[in-house]
A protein has these predicted regions:
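Short, well-ordered junction/capping motifs at the entry into regular secondary structure
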Residues: 1-2
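Extended alpha-helical targeting/anchoring segments
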Residues: 6-184
């Protein structure tokens, strides 16, 4: 993940992101984790990476994105798929069970909905879920924004800190604008 500042810098930053060995290895690890999660509930021959390492641009940041799909095994339910895929490896890390234990040990505050899912199961056996990130939560007139970065062997702490700031920026800005509008 990198910040965005101008169209001209986007071209350079796209190349930088795709050429960065740390970003590439982290992303490939997450793609492999997604393939593994889906292979537990899908027909094995159907699990495939349909797009690999595309760049997606958002208002304040750009990400490397990939898409992994599979045909759900007829003996599996939407709930089976959900429990296999979530919490998402992009928010936990790998190996997932140990990564979740480490998060519980090290993070000073409970994540709450952050990193969880928002979505639905329907009566036809479908589900549609989104990961609850890039969000602001308001309780008792106090807003909180959470963000994080993936830590791997090649991580540079200052870069990971900047990544969390870049990720949180749009949500913080939205809260600030809402507060200004409320005062009008």
């Amino acid at each position: 993940t990198l910040d965005r500042s101008s169209a001209a810098s986007d071209v350079y930053k796209r190349q930088e992101l795709l050429a960065d060995p740390k970003e590439r290895s982290e992303h490939i690890m997450l793609v492999d984790l997604a393939r593994n999660d889906l292979s537990r509930v899908c027909r094995p021959e159907s699990v495939e990476v349909v797009s690999l390492m595309d760049i997606k641009r958002f208002s304040h940041i750009m990400h490397i994105c990939s898409t992994v799909t599979g045909q759900v095994d007829p003996h599996m339910t939407a709930f089976d798929v959900f429990t296999s895929a979530f919490p998402a490896g992009t928010l936990s890390g790998a190996p997932k069970p140990r990564a979740i234990e480490i998060i519980d040990e090290l993070e000073p505050a409970d994540r709450g909905i952050y990193g969880g899912t928002v979505g639905y199961f329907d009566f036809s056996g479908n589900l549609d879920m989104a990961i609850a990130i890039r969000t602001a939560f308001i309780r008792d007139h106090e807003a909180s924004v959470q963000a994080g970065a993936g830590i791997v062997l090649d991580s540079v702490p200052a870069s990971e800190w900047q990544e969390t700031r870049n990720k949180a920026e749009a949500s913080v800005e939205a809260v600030q604008i809402a507060a200004q509008l409320r005062q009008l």
